[in-house]
Amino acid sequence: MATAAGMGIGAACLVAPQVRPGRRLRLQRVRRRCVAELSRDGGSAQRPLAPAPLVKQPVLPTFLVPTSTPPAPTQSPAPAPTPPPLPDSGVGEIEPDLEGLTEDSIDKTIFVASEQESEIMDVKEQAQAKVTRSVVFVTGEASPYAKSGGLGDVCGSLPIALALRGHRVMVVMPRYMNGALNKNFANAFYTEKHIKIPCFGGEHEVTFFHEYRDSVDWVFVDHPSYHRPGNLYGDNFGAFGDNQFRYTLLCYAACEAPLILELGGYIYGQKCMFVVNDWHASLVPVLLAAKYRPYGVYRDARSVLVIHNLAHQGVEPASTYPDLGLPPEWYGALEWVFPEWARRHALDKGEAVNFLKGAVVTADRIVTVSQGYSWEVTTAEGGQGLNELLSSRKSVLNGIVNGIDINDWNPSTDKFLPYHYSVDDLSGKAKCKAELQKELGLPIRPDVPLIGFIGRLDYQKGIDLIKLAIPDLMRDNIQFVMLGSGDPGFEGWMRSTESGYRDKFRGWVGFSVPVSHRITAGCDILLMPSRFEPCGLNQLYAMQYGTVPVVHGTGGLRDTVENFNPFAEKGEQGTGWAFSPLTIEKMLWALRMAISTYREHKSSWEGLMKRGMSSDFTWDHAASQYEQIFEWAFMDQPYVM
C-alpha cells in the first residue's frame, strides 16, 4: 500500500476503512479529494509544508508561534523512477486498466471503485461553482453544536451548502463546555495544535479540535473561558463580563487556523475568504489588516462581514483597547463615541471601542441577511449609530436572504408531524390542523381559521400589539395559538388570556422544536408583527408548510412575503400580507383580509398556499449569491491603512 506522502496532496484523508463504506461515504471522500485537486491546480490552497519551516519563514508574523515545533522530516534517498501510485480510494485494492491514460489525465481524474463498479469522475465537473475557494467562517455559534438564535442556523447550514458546491470550507467557533453542550462536541478530536495569543496583559494558550462532517471542516477553539455554566454569552445575571476577551481569542485563533492546521493532510493557506459573522468575529478583518498584511501574510485573502443583527456591536470601554494587542495607530478603526444622551454622567466622554465598527471599516465586502435590511442599516432609524459609516460603504454593501434547511423543514418528510403533505397533495395539512387542535385542547373545527405566533415574547417581536389586539380578535370566530418565552409580563398575560378564552386561545410558555413544527404545519395563518426583522425564518418555514404569513413589512419580512393581489397575472398573485406602518389598525386590517380570503375564496387561498410552498428559499440558492460576493471581493485590493 502506498504511503500518504507518496500519494500527494489530499491523500492523507483517504484512509482505507475496516468496513466497506456505502456509496454516500465514497462520494463524500471523492468530493473532498476533488476540492484538494482543485486547490492544488487553482492555487487557492498551498501545498502542505513541513510544520517547522512554517514557523521559521521570515514572511510570517512572529507574534503568534505554535508552542511546540515538530522535528523537520528527514531527507531520504530518491527512489528509482516508478510509475505514479494509484490514489487509494479507501474501498480496497483495484487494478484498473491505465493503458492510454496520460499524465495530465491522471491529475484530472479520480478513480472510485467497489467490487461491483468502477467510475471515473472528472475533477473539474465535480464542482458546481465556477471558481472554487477556501472559505473560512468565523462565528460565535453554529448548529448543531451551539445555538442561541438565527445566527447558529445560518452558520450551521450555509457552510454545508457552499461545500456541496465544490468549495473547501472551514468553520471556526468556540468549544463551549457547559455540561449540556458537551455531547455536541463528542466527535471532535484534539489536533495536537496549540498557540499562545498575546493579549489582555499576557499570553493565553488555546488549542484546536476538529470534526469533518457534511464535507465541512468544523474547527473548535478550546480555552477555559468557554467552559462555564449558562448559555453561550451569559447567565441569569446577564452577559459575561469577559466576552470581549473570549471573542478576541476566537478571532486570533481563526486567523491562525488556516496557516497551521493540516486538515485532511494539508493547510488552507493564505488565499482564503474569511466570512465573519456579527461582532463576535469582527476583529478578524482588523487583524488581517493590522497584524498580518504588514508582514506579507494574507495579502491574497479577503474578508466579508455578515451582519445578522446590528443591535449587537460588541462595545466596551476605550480603556480596553490596549488589551486587544493591536498597534496604537489602529485605535481609530474601532473608536466609538456615545451620544451625549447615552453617557452616564457629565464627565463621561463617551469613548469606547466597537468591534463591529472595526469590521465595517476594514472588511472587503459587507452583507446583511436581506435586501431590505441592507437599506435599513443606512438609515438613522435602523443604523444603530453606524448608519453614516455604512452609508459611506454602500458600494460594497449587499443583502442576501437566508435559506432554510429543507431536510429539517419539509412537510413531506417532517418527523414531528402526524401526517405528511406536499404542494401536490394538501390533504395532510387539514389532518395536521385537527391533530394540533386536539393536542392543544381546542375544539376541532376545520372551518375556523387557526392563527399562530412563534417567537420571543419581547417588544421587538410586537407582542404588545398582539396583546392589545386580542380582545378585538376574540370577538371573531377564530382560534389563536402562541409559542414562546421571554418577558415575564407577557408570559403571565398569555396564561391569563388562555384562562379567559378557553375555546379560542392557547399560550405555550417555553419553546419546543417538535411543537413549533406542528404549529407551523397546523395553523392556517402565521402572524409576525416584528418592529424590525433583519431576515426572519418563521415566515419562510410557514410558506414552506403552506401556512400563509401576515407580517409587518420590514427588513427580510418585506423581501420574502409578497402581498396578495387577486388581480395580478396567474402565478404572481402573492404569498401573504405585509402591512405597514406598524399599528394595531393596520395589523387587524391585514388579519381580517386573510381571514376573509380563507373563508370566502377557497381557490385563492389554495393558490396562496401553493405559491408559498413553491418558493425557492433553499440554502443552495443563497450560496450561489454568496459566491458572487466572493468574486467581487477578490476583484478589489484588500484593505490596508
Curated annotation (Swiss-Prot):
ADP-alpha-D-glucose binds at residue 147. It comes from Oryza sativa subsp. japonica (Rice). Disruption phenotype: Decrease in average length of amylopectin chains. Reduced content of amylopectin chains with a degree of polymerization (DP) of 8 to 12, but increased content of chains with a DP of 6 to 7 and a DP of 16 to 19. Involved in starch synthesis in endosperm amyloplasts. Plays a role in the elongation of amylopectin chains. Synthesizes preferentially amylopectin chains with a degree of polymerization (DP) of 7 to 11 by elongating chains with a DP of 4 to 7. Generates distincly chains with a DP of 8 to 12 chains from short chains with a DP of 6 to 7. InterPro entries: Glyco_trans_1, GS/SS, Starch_synth_cat_dom. GO terms for cellular component: amyloplast; chloroplast. This is Soluble starch synthase 1, chloroplastic/amyloplastic. Residues 62-96 are annotated as: Disordered. The lineage of its organism: Eukaryota, Viridiplantae, Streptophyta, Embryophyta, Tracheophyta. Residues 1-113 form a transit peptide. Pfam families: Glyco_transf_5, Glycos_transf_1. One of its GO terms (biological process) is amylopectin biosynthetic process.
